[in-house]
């Protein structure tokens, strides 16, 4: 009986402290899944550099979240190197709706610079 009581207390404590994932809420990207965020960002950087810019190269991703919206929305904080080899830490949002023409919208928000919003095809 004592063991059953202990098991019940442990179960209740586990359930009370569990944090269920909210459907549609942003989720932090970690570990191996960070590679996918890196690929998504590099693909957008390449497409934009081939067009009218901006021209950045990824140095490293500091943090990332992903969210299912009307498509997917990746919010990435990363160190980017510009065409003058200057490294800056920027917040980048990639909203992907690949079924639309030019359905990838990329927003760069870098300190001390105006926000840049560009679109490209999938």
Curated annotation (Swiss-Prot):
<feature type="site" description="Reactive site">
    <location>
        <position position="24"/>
    </location>
</feature>
<dbReference type="Pfam" id="PF00031">
    <property type="entry name" value="Cystatin"/>
</dbReference>
<feature type="short sequence motif" description="Secondary area of contact">
    <location>
        <begin position="67"/>
        <end position="71"/>
    </location>
</feature>
<dbReference type="InterPro" id="IPR018073">
    <property type="entry name" value="Prot_inh_cystat_CS"/>
</dbReference>
<keyword id="KW-0789">Thiol protease inhibitor</keyword>
<dbReference type="GO" id="GO:0004869">
    <property type="term" value="F:cysteine-type endopeptidase inhibitor activity"/>
</dbReference>
<comment type="function">
    <text>Selectively inhibits the activity of cysteine proteinase of hemocytes, protecting developing adult tissue in pupae from attack by the proteinase.</text>
</comment>
<comment type="similarity">
    <text>Belongs to the cystatin family.</text>
</comment>
<dbReference type="InterPro" id="IPR053128">
    <property type="entry name" value="Cystatin-like"/>
</dbReference>
<feature type="modified residue" description="Pyrrolidone carboxylic acid">
    <location>
        <position position="21"/>
    </location>
</feature>
<protein>
    <recommendedName>
        <fullName>Sarcocystatin-A</fullName>
    </recommendedName>
</protein>
<keyword id="KW-0873">Pyrrolidone carboxylic acid</keyword>
<feature type="signal peptide">
    <location>
        <begin position="1"/>
        <end position="20"/>
    </location>
</feature>
<dbReference type="InterPro" id="IPR000010">
    <property type="entry name" value="Cystatin_dom"/>
</dbReference>
<dbReference type="InterPro" id="IPR046350">
    <property type="entry name" value="Cystatin_sf"/>
</dbReference>
<keyword id="KW-0732">Signal</keyword>
<keyword id="KW-0646">Protease inhibitor</keyword>
């Amino acid at each position: 009986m004592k063991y059953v009581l202990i098991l019940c207390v442990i179960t209740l404590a586990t359930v009370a402290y569990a944090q269920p994932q909210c459907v549609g809420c942003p989720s932090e990207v970690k570990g191996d899944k960070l590679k996918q965020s890196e690929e998504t960002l590099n693909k957008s950087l390449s497409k934009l550099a081939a067009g009218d810019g901006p021209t950045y190269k990824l140095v490293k991703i500091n943090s990332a979240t992903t969210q299912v919206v009307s498509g997917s929305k990746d919010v990435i904080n990363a160190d980017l190197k510009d065409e003058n080899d200057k490294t800056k830490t920027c917040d980048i949002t990639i909203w992907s709706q690949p079924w639309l023409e030019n359905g990838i919208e990329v927003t760069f928000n870098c300190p001390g610079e105006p926000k840049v919003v560009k679109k490209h095809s999938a």
